[in-house]
């Protein structure tokens, strides 16, 4: 098996080739992600079934204008759109409190969905700004980026006001939590049920803080099955050598 088998088990290689048909680039994506992140077989199967290849790095952001080049590329890569929250088990009507509680009741799966390096800091995290108490929905620290990540969850459609609130929290974290020499600039991520892409892009352009906007989905979704011949071990190895 050569290059593939030397870093991941044959069973996982076969799983990728069985599930990802006629798309060498997609197969290589899952190979690289499995090796780099040490995914278990169940995690690999989950990310294939929820089509991570098509979702990763797809959030609308202003990172290229607000972060150093090296950090902006990695920050973008760590985003998803949409985020798959089917693991919450929520069906029917719900409110933001129910969704946030369901995310934290499944914190391990939530962290896996957020991506590499995310560590949970707190829910309704209190920030005293001047004489006012403010509460961040969810606060994380990303070890890969060495920065705090403010996550706001909205069950409705994106609104301009959401960016103003998120940007304010990001600035506050930089003043109150960030340590010079240890932490990179704080990033904000808004995860909403629906967004108008043009409106979201305009809102991002209006902010000087590094922010991203993504949607979430509560339903299980699977990649469209592609008919054709699956890539062979030799084809994958050849592509790896080319890269």
What are these regions (language model features)?
Residues 29-36:
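Short, small/acidic-rich helices and loops at N termini and domain boundaries
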Residues 103, 136-140, 147-155, 168-171, ...:
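Conserved catalytic cores of phosphodiester-cleaving nucleases, focusing on short active-site segments
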Residues 202-243:
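Polybasic (Lys/Arg-rich)
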Residues 1-5, 9-10:
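Single conserved hydrophobic/aromatic residue that forms the stacking wall/gate
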Residues 116-144:
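Active-site metal-binding core of divalent-cation-utilizing nuclease and nuclease-like domains
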Residues 53-93:
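Interdomain/boundary linker segments immediately adjacent to catalytic/signaling cores
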């Amino acid at each position: 098996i050569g290059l593939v088998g030397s870093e991941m088990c044959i069973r996982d290689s076969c799983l990728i080739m069985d599930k990802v048909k006629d798309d060498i680039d997609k197969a290589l994506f899952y190979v690289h992600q499995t090796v780099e992140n040490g995914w278990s077989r169940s995690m690999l199967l989950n990310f294939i079934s929820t089509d991570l290849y098509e979702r990763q790095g797809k959030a609308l952001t202003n990172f290229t204008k607000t972060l150093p080049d090296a950090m902006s590329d990695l920050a973008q890569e760590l985003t998803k759109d949409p985020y798959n929250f089917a693991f919450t088990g929520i069906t029917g009507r719900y409110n933001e409190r129910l969704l946030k509680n369901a995310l934290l009741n499944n914190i391990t799966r939530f962290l896996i969905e957020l991506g590499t390096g995310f560590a949970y800091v707190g829910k309704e995290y209190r920030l005293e700004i001047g004489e006012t108490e403010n509460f961040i929905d969810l606060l994380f620290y990303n070890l890969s980026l060495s920065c705090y990540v403010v996550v706001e969850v909205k069950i409705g459609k994106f609104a301009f006001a959401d960016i103003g609130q998120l940007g304010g929290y990001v600035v506050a974290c930089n003043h109150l939590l960030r340590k010079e020499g240890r932490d990179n600039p704080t990033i904000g991520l808004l995860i909403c049920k629906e967004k108008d892409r043009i409106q979201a892009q305009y809102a991002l352009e209006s902010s000087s803080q590094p922010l991203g906007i993504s949607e979430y989905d509560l339903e299980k979704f699977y990649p469209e099955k592609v008919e054709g011949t699956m890539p062979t071990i030799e084809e994958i190895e050849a592509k790896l050598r080319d890269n």
